[in-house]
Every structure is written in structure tokens, then in C-alpha cells.
């Protein structure tokens, strides 16, 4: 799949190894290969060139709670709502992030992990609401859901580029918006957008739909499976004891 942006002097031509990720019962992650080229109808402009690729999963609000120990018991003390937190977010670059993108461009386009999420709804008495956002970032980085991949885009002769981004097994179903930015001296001069479709298939799709559309039947089926599994295990151990 190849597409291009419409830009006067430089164009991004992009290819994907796959534009769909299927989540099956044994899904353990996937790797997306992104490759492309920068087409020019004039000599290459002056200035340091940068290539940035982002992949953002579906965004959902999150209530982040801070626990505090009172009388020997951990209780929820403060809550801040993070209203835009991608379930997955990866940023790949061909050079250190700060060297190829100005902060004002990052602020405008929300490219860095820190800019990609925002928090609202912090009560007036909470002075460090930013720490709640930082907690979300820290936790999701540990889960490999948020990734900063500096110097991971290979650029050949300032024209061809490629990179691979690992997507973990615990992906959320939905559209994953992919953006490619071309920068000069930290300013964005070209951008291309596309989408990767992540969806459950087979048994995973059937069980997911059943749990949403017929929760009672799904619950009864789960209970029946649990009872049957317990009976099988009990029968097996009785057989072992008598042999």
C-alpha cells in the first residue's frame, strides 16, 4: 500500500508491511514495518532533516487515583481524570527527538508522549495534577504500551527511510492512527496520515461480541465451563488416587 501527501517541494511516500492486525486467541504481539521515501521536485532544501513516525491507539478517559496509607490501610486519597490517553503510543525518530522538532511544533501537533495525553478535572486542592499524568506514562511505558524510539528510523541518502515498531499482545481493538512527519530545522514541512486496523477475529471476536450483546448468556456459559473444568479436574485426581 503506497500513498503520498500533496506538498509543493517534498512529498512523503509511505508503505506498510500490513495495515491490519488480527487479534486471535494465541496473539502475542506484532511488528509493523514502515518504509518509504521522500520525493522532491527540486534540489533538497537546506536545514537538518528529521523523520518522525507516530502510532496512536484508541484514546479513552482514565480516572487516576492516588492512594494514601491511613491507620494502616491503603485508601484512595486524590483523583484526577486524564481525558485523552491513547491505549498505545509509539514515537520513532531518525535522531534525538529534541534535535529535529521544535517545542512549539510539538505543542501544536502533540507529537511527544507527554503532549499526546492531557489531564482535566483536577480539584483545586490538588497542586501536582501533572504527577497523575506522569504516572499513566510511567505505567504504560513499563507495559511497553508507550514507546519512545529515538534513532530507530534508518534514513539512506536523505531519501529512503524505514523502521519497525513492536506492538505488544495487550492491544486495544480499534483504529491505530499513524502519522509521518518530515521536518527541517525542527519545523514540520510535510505530513502523511494513515490508519492500521486492529481487531479481534475468530473465537476472540465471538466471545467479545457475546459478552457485549448477551452478557447473561456469556456469564452462564463461563459458569458452565468453570463447573465442567472443575469436574474434569476432580475426576482426574480421583482416578490418580485409585490407581
Regions found by a protein language model. Name each.
Residues 69-168, 172:
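Membrane-proximal low-complexity regions enriched in glycine and acidic/polar residues
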Residues 9-26:
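N-terminal edge beta-strand
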Residues 216-243:
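Juxtamembrane interface at the cytosolic side of transmembrane helices
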Residues 42-47, 171-173:
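A short beta-turn/strand-edge loop motif at beta-sheet boundaries
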Residues 166, 189-220:
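Short, aromatic-rich amphipathic segments at membrane interfaces
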Residues 170-200:
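Extended, hydrophilic extramembrane loops/domains of integral membrane proteins
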Residues 38-40:
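Short solvent-exposed capping/turn motifs at the termini of beta-strands
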Amino acid at each position: 500500500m503506497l500513498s503520498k501527501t500533496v506538498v509543493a517541494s517534498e512529498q512523503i511516500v509511505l508503505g506498510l508491511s500490513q495495515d491490519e492486525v488480527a487479534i486471535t486467541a494465541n496473539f502475542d504481539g506484532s511488528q509493523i514495518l514502515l518504509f518509504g521515501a521522500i520525493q522532491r521536485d527540486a534540489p533538497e532544501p537546506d536545514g537538518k532533516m528529521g523523520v518522525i513516525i507516530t502510532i496512536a491507539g484508541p484514546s479513552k478517559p482514565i480516572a487516576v487515583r492516588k492512594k494514601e496509607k491511613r491507620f494502616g490501610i491503603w485508601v484512595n486519597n486524590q483523583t484526577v481524570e486524564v481525558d485523552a490517553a491513547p491505549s498505545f503510543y509509539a514515537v520513532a525518530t531518525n535522531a534525538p527527538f529534541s534535535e529535529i522538532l521544535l517545542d512549539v511544533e510539538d505543542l501544536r501537533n502533540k507529537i511527544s508522549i507527554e503532549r499526546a495525553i492531557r489531564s482535566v478535572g483536577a480539584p483545586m486542592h490538588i497542586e501536582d495534577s501533572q504527577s497523575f499524568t506522569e504516572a499513566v506514562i510511567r505505567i504504560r511505558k513499563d507495559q511497553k504500551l508507550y514507546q519512545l524510539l529515538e534513532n530507530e528510523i534508518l534514513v539512506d541518502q536523505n531519501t529512503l527511510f524505514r523502521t519497525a515498531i513492536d506492538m505488544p499482545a495487550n492491544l486495544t481493538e480499534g483504529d491505530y492512527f499513524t502519522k509521518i512527519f518530515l521536518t527541517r530545522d525542527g519545523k514540520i514541512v510535510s505530513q502523511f496520515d494513515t490508519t492500521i486496523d486492529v481487531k479481534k477475529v475468530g473465537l476472540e471476536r465471538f466471545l467479545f461480541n457475546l459478552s457485549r450483546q448477551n452478557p447473561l448468556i456469556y456469564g452462564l456459559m463461563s459458569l458452565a465451563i468453570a463447573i465442567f473444568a472443575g469436574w474434569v479436574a476432580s475426576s482426574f485426581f480421583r482416578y490418580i488416587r485409585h490407581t
